[in-house]
């Protein structure tokens, strides 16, 4: 029987103050995985599934967030953290090496913390479009300025992810790998809102079909190097209808959206977006909803709005069965709207913590009961 809902997180996890102690030899990577396994390692109820994930960011220092974690996966690529951001180029700097060490220590911790685990295990990375906007070339320009460099990113990422997933399978033989590909800045890239280093102008709009070509290249590479099929890849996108349509047309099988960012169905723009989501659902695409379960995050109202819009589109509430709910603090919402620079380091407070995941787990039974009717 298919689950009524699946619960997971956005790939980040922040340990609480004072959580590290002698019980785990003061190893934050081991402790984080042990805590995550206790939260998401076993489904809380028969019809509520969970998707455990390998944390890509613990926020322990400046090199421990999603961007450097993804850069450490790029095959045959080097660089460093410069004054203006993460630079791709000759030589491996200390910060880049630290990001690689974080990746390796997380994998080593998985061997112990996930001993005997059997089930889904997600890895999270930035997508190639967001990477192009968030990184810099040796010249100081963003990678987005060099279309040749942008075209290289999907294959470099696919090769690196393939190696990473092979190591993960070796350390956790019972794992069924899943990939959450976060394109937090895709709206700003496609709409031409990414600033140049001077800040006086923006880079030209990057057409959605070209973004689709990058994703196709990445998914083809992943099928080749890691036997990861489209059903095991979730693409997190923004609220640009051309991006959503492109993702559907190239065969993306799992789409993650933040319903809090979607315009109302009653508006012309909202009608087009919601109808595009409905078309994706009708074509067999699985929908995943990023929600903020924290107090003040408005999760209940957001999910009520999803079901209300779903019914106005002609669906029954039961048709929302099978959705995945992703715990997410909403930090990337501002990136999607083009406010902060995607190259900037996020604050540690934007990462998930135990309380946030627990809040989503507590809300899951009520959601499951509603969509079961």
Regions of interest found by a model, annotated:
Residues 115-117, 155-178, 217-230:
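Secondary-structure boundary elements
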Residues 10-12, 126-130, 182-186, 236-242, ...:
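Active-site beta-loop-alpha junctions enriched in small/polar residues
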Residues 1-126, 131-145, 319-321, 333-373:
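Alpha/beta catalytic barrel-like cores
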Residues 142-160, 196-223, 254-267:
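Acidic, His- and aromatic-enriched active-site or binding-groove loops in soluble protein domains
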Residues 122-141, 172-203, 239, 252:
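Active-site-proximal loop/short-helix segments
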Residues 253-373:
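Catalytic-face loop-and-helix region of soluble metabolic enzyme cores
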Residues 95-111, 151-164, 305:
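Glycine-rich anion/phosphate-binding loops
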Residues 2-8, 12-16, 45-55, 120-122, ...:
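Structural preference for beta-strand elements that scaffold enzyme active sites
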């Amino acid at each position: 029987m298919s689950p009524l809902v699946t619960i997971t997180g956005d790939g980040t996890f922040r340990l609480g103050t004072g959580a590290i102690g002698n019980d785990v030899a003061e190893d934050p990577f081991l402790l984080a995985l042990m805590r995550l396994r206790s939260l998401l390692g076993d489904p809380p109820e028969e019809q509520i599934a969970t998707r455990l994930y390998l944390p890509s960011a613990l926020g322990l220092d400046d090199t421990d967030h999603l961007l450097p974690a993804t850069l450490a996966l790029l095959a045959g690529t080097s660089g460093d953290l410069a004054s203006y951001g993460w630079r791709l180029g000759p030589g491996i700097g200390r910060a880049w090496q630290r990001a690689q060490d974080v990746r390796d220590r997380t994998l080593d911790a998985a061997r112990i913390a996930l001993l005997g685990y059997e089930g889904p295990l997600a890895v999270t990375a930035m997508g190639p479009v967001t990477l192009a906007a968030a990184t810099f070339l040796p010249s100081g320009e963003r990678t987005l300025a060099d279309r040749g460099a942008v075209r290289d990113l999907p294959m470099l990422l696919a090769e690196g992810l393939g190696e990473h997933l092979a190591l993960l399978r070796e350390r956790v033989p019972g794992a069924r790998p899943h990939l959450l590909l976060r394109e937090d800045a895709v709206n700003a890239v496609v709409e031409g809102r990414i600033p140049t280093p001077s800040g006086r102008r923006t880079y030209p709009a990057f057409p959605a079909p070209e973004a689709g070509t990058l994703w196709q290249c990445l998914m083809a590479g992943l099928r080749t190097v890691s036997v990861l099929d489209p059903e095991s890849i979730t693409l997190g996108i923004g609220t640009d209808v051309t991006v959503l349509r492109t993702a559907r047309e190239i065969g993306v099988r799992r789409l993650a959206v933040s319903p809090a960012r979607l315009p109302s169905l009653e508006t012309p723009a909202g009608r087009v977006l919601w109808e595009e989501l409905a078309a994706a659902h009708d074509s067999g695409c699985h929908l995943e909803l990023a929600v903020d379960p924290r107090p003040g995050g408005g999760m209940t109202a957001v999910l009520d709005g999803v079901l209300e819009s779903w019914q106005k589109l002609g669906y029954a509430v039961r048709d929302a069965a099978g959705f995945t709910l992703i715990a997410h603090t909403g930090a990337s919402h501002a990136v999607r709207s083009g406010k902060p620079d995607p190259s900037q380091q996020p604050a540690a407070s934007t990462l998930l913590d135990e309380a946030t995941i627990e809040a989503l787990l507590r809300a899951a039974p009520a959601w499951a009961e509603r969509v079961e009717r």
